[in-house]
Amino acid sequence: MDFIRKQVDVLKKPFTKGGKLEKLYPAFNAFETMLFVPDHTTSKGSHIRDGVDLKRTMITVIIALVPALFYGMYNTGYQYYIQTNIEFTFFDAVLHGAYKIFPMIAVSYAVGLAIEFAFAVYRNHPVNEGYLVTGLLIPMIMPIDMPLWMLAISVIFAVLIAKEAFGGTGMNILNPALTARAFAFFAYPTFMTGDKVWVSEATNIDGISGETILGTLAANGEVAYSSASMFMGSIPGSVAETSVFFVLIGALLLIITGVGSWRIMLSGVIGASVVGILFNLWGANSLMSFEWYNHLLVGGFAFGIVFMATDPVSAAQTTKGKWIYGFLVGVFCILIRVFNPAYPEGVMLAILLMNVFAPLIDHYVIESNVSMRRKRWQGAKLETT
């Protein structure tokens, strides 16, 4: 490591103040920070000695995403091969999935990081590690055969509008990854819905049936998958959203490390379950009659409530606010699924909606606490007098 440190120090000289490449220092600083812990410290304000910085927090989330990502690779190949009736092995499925998914990840990182670097140089501030997670999340929540140019445009929109327009990492109101998906959904709806977008190379296969479970229910069809299949994720869907089992592995890591809020996750499940049970009692259509516990297993609910709703920037910040925020995400997710037949998956819109209301929730939670303390103080003052 000492050898690498010395080489980096040699490369650093042209980028320091007064050097020929001074304006590109933020880009070099990002490279240096990726290799070593930053050597700068705060000069004023509160000082907290902690071994966890933004980079390590982002890496923790990426590690939590890996199980769902690798299963997504397998499921991509699995869904393709079972439609073609070609004999295949586990490794055949994984290789096909990797062949389809890795270019999407590469495009997402290349385009997104290029914009991040450009803004860092323009604003003369360090490149933050926030996009490390966003750049992986975006391709994981997209259909497998989404054209790469379309993915690139969605990334550009998300980074510019949902992130940089608000000031960059830590300042965004909306979740950037979900903003990218929302843009793609409304700008290119034919590539985001239907029975041809969820299975790799579906347009080249005659008679394919790749409709998602929620899409089938929205059309009053019968579901051909068991709850076990839904839980494990061997069903059509977005790249890495289908397996609840592997999402829960990531959720466990986020909870243990304290990176993800278990309050938001649990309250989201409670909210969705309550509304799902009420609709089961009503049972007016296929989506209402769909078992409440299966609502938790299909679509992007598990992935969204674990990795999207818990975004520490766009989610509620107060303890009570997290319970309210998560509960309402679950409630609106099921409501949108049931009452919006044109878009049976509701978790994306539910989370984005609650992102907008998260500051308001925190505001009233804080105001409520201040009011309670004021009344308590006034009561204590009266007793002493």
Regions found by a protein language model. Give the residues of each.
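Loop-to-transmembrane alpha-helix initiation sites
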Residues: 152, 173-178, 292-299, 322, ...
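A beta-strand-loop signature enriched in Asp, Gly, Thr, and Trp
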Residues: 265-270, 274-319
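Hydrophobic, membrane-inserted alpha-helices
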Residues: 111-116, 131-140, 155-162, 246-254, ...
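Long hydrophobic alpha-helical segments that form multi-pass transmembrane helix bundles
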Residues: 170-248
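N-terminal signal-anchor module of multipass membrane proteins
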Residues: 1-105, 384-385
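Membrane-interface helix-loop-helix junctions at boundaries between adjacent transmembrane segments
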Residues: 126-205
